[in-house]
Amino acid sequence: VKSSAASDVYKRQIKNNSFDKVFIFNSSIRYRLICKIAGIKRIFQYPLFEKKEQHVIEAAQKLLEKIDLKVESNPQIKVDESLIKLAEQNFSISKNKINILLGIGGSGSSKRIPANKFKQFIELTLKDYECIFYLATGKNQEEQLILKSILSSYKEICISLDNNSISEILPIIKNCKISICNDSSFSHLSAALNVPTIVLMSDTPLLYGSYSPNMYPIIPDGMENVSHNSRGKEKINPEKIFKKFKSIIS
């Protein structure tokens, strides 16, 4: 909600629905004022003006505790066993190989680790392991360039998932032994599916890739922490990814 006109639209929409209460997972005073003007009596919200130092998991947990809900920080997604078996058959997934999800997409350019980093990691794994890589990404032009670059070198051992829906991809992820993902939707989905997930953190707070016990964050070389505007995608080290990969699957 970035303009007065947009705020007016939101106020009308909210008021027309006659809500009794609202939950605002944000510290914005603007959202609170819109809800008050719309006549909502009970407003549950993160503490105001605390966004900069806010712990996104703890803030949400404390907010939900106000209505006696206790939520863990390790969300889980359940996939029907029959769908997992069906994906195994449809994609000829072999348990004799290490099946690896590569989440190569991302919501912004600064989150998209360059193709050469993934290719170097693939090259390292092939020296010691027999692997199949499932490439999960969207249709964004930059994402497609990353996808094509990887396929140009490793087409025989890579399967692209960019034409599959999320519901089709979930059982495939569940068949994987491990995932290596940018900070993207696939890192969260993979971890929630109880698959060990190495998260490549280049430009967002470390917490986003470490809140789950299934997440193993990798940060750029030369940095002790990572946050918004770290711009570290060129400093992600494939050898560090491989070292973490070996420690997880061994």
Task: Describe these PLM feature segments.
Residues 15-27, 176-181:
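Short N-terminal targeting/anchoring amphipathic segment
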Residues 40-111, 115:
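Mid-sequence helix-capping/hinge segment at a functional interface
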Residues 1-6, 10:
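Single conserved hydrophobic/aromatic residue that forms the stacking wall/gate
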Residues 117-203:
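Donor-binding and catalytic core of enzymes assembling or modifying cell-surface/extracellular glycoconjugates
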